A protein has these predicted regions:
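Short, glycine/acidic-enriched capping/hinge loops at junctions between secondary-structure elements
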Residues: 4-7, 93-95, 205
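N-terminal phosphate/diphosphate-binding loop that engages ATP/GTP or pyrophosphate donors
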Residues: 1-77
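Phosphate-binding/switch loop-helix module in NTP-utilizing enzymes
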Residues: 45-125
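Conserved catalytic-core segment of NTP-binding enzymes
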Residues: 96-194, 200-203
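C-terminal boundary of histidine-terminating zinc-finger modules
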Residues: 205-215
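C-terminal alpha-helix
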Residues: 217-228
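Structural signal for conserved beta-strand scaffold positions within catalytic alpha/beta enzyme cores
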Residues: 17, 81-83, 141, 193-196
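Short, small-residue-enriched loops and turns at beta-alpha junctions
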Residues: 22-25, 34, 89-90, 125, ...
Length: 228
């Protein structure tokens, strides 16, 4: 519920609705081939030198950014925002179909040379179990100052090695008296930004308003991503 408001956008419709909701998607799942090999994201819009991309189990054709259905996209300042789906009703079942659709959508997406995809996953490690991360260039882990978050950060390093992805860390809500402890709990050589504890960030997020604050660490992070 927070990402679109933090970006100053409207809430996008769930992409799951493109397939008739969870019910329609599950029907397609049952009718689809049980196993299909994909190459993942085709960078630069080309698969030259690679085996031909196989047809998706769920999409009629491969998509580029220009093929994204506009009714499921919010856009501002050149940034497109999409949402796969959420649990909206009590007792509707697990979120597994959302994980499947996320992976299939990413595998079906062709990228131009200037295109960049950022996937905001749920907190925790479940997306690794679903294989969502397998074609990512890098993984950014936001680490909060909590025991659970610091312990999980070590697990992300392990998963990154298993899926062949580089893992970097963003320390969040950093205060001077806990900074060293947070750095000691992660692979400090891969810390690319330290976001300070700022009351105005908390209050803006609490009210669901757009985050338009100027932070040097965010600029540093953006520059790191640009060069990566």
């Amino acid at each position: 519920y927070g990402l679109h408001s933090q970006l100053g956008m409207g809430a996008p419709k769930d992409l799951m609705g493109y397939f008739g909701g969870k019910t329609g998607f599950k029907e397609k799942q049952r009718a689809a081939p049980k196993k299909t090999q994909f190459l993942g994201l085709a960078a630069s819009g080309s698969t030259s030198g690679q085996p031909a991309q196989q047809k998706s189990r769920f999409f009629d054709k491969r998509w580029s950014f220009s093929d994204l259905p506009p009714e499921f996209v919010e856009e501002k300042d050149g940034v497109k925002l999409m949402a796969v789906g959420k649990i909206h009703n009590f007792g509707e079942g697990c979120a597994c179909p959302m994980g499947v659709l996320t992976r299939e959508f990413l595998e079906n997406l062709d990228l131009g040379k200037d295109d960049l995809v950022i996937v905001d996953t749920e907190a925790g490690t479940e997306h690794f179990g679903r294989g969502v991360d397998k074609d990512f260039d890098l993984i950014l882990v936001v680490v909060d100052p909590s025991y659970e978050s610091l312990r999980l950060s070590k697990k992300f390093d392990e998963f990154g090695e298993q899926c062949g992805c580089k893992v970097y860390f963003v320390l969040n809500k950093v205060e001077p008296d806990i900074r060293e402890e947070m750095l000691a709990s992660v692979n400090c050589t891969n810390v690319v930004a330290e976001i300070p504890e700022r009351r105005e960030i908390f209050k803006t997020s609490l009210k669901g308003k757009e985050l338009n604050l100027e932070l040097d660490e965010i600029k540093k992070l953006a520059e790191f991503l640009r060069k990566s």
